[in-house]
Amino acid sequence: MPGLKAAEIDGRLEAAGIEMVYVVCVNDGAVMTAWKKDQGLAASDLIEFVADTDSDLTDALGLQLTGDGKPYGKSTGPNNALGYNSRRCKRTCMYVDHGVVKVMQVAEALDDPAGDDRPELACI
């Protein structure tokens, strides 16, 4: 998030023709509002934090975090860490132009299904 905030402040996003940035997470609206505020982006009109409460968008894009062939949280071992029926989205970055996904990068690997160790792979 710090890089995103800096890019907004110094005008790089606007200069690149980016009209809106959406940070989407499988969570509720209250958490997303608090996260935006925590990141110092509460006043931003360019960067919006959006709750995918029931993971509908995540599922439609095929980005549900899974492990051992099962939805995250429904298997044994490390993928059960978030609890039964937990839904999470893979770390992803997309460039969408007029509703068409032009570029989608997912930061994941067999040893890192969430992309936490390689967040730069989901940067455009």
Model regions and ranges:
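Chalcogenol-based redox active-site neighborhoods
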Residues: 1-124
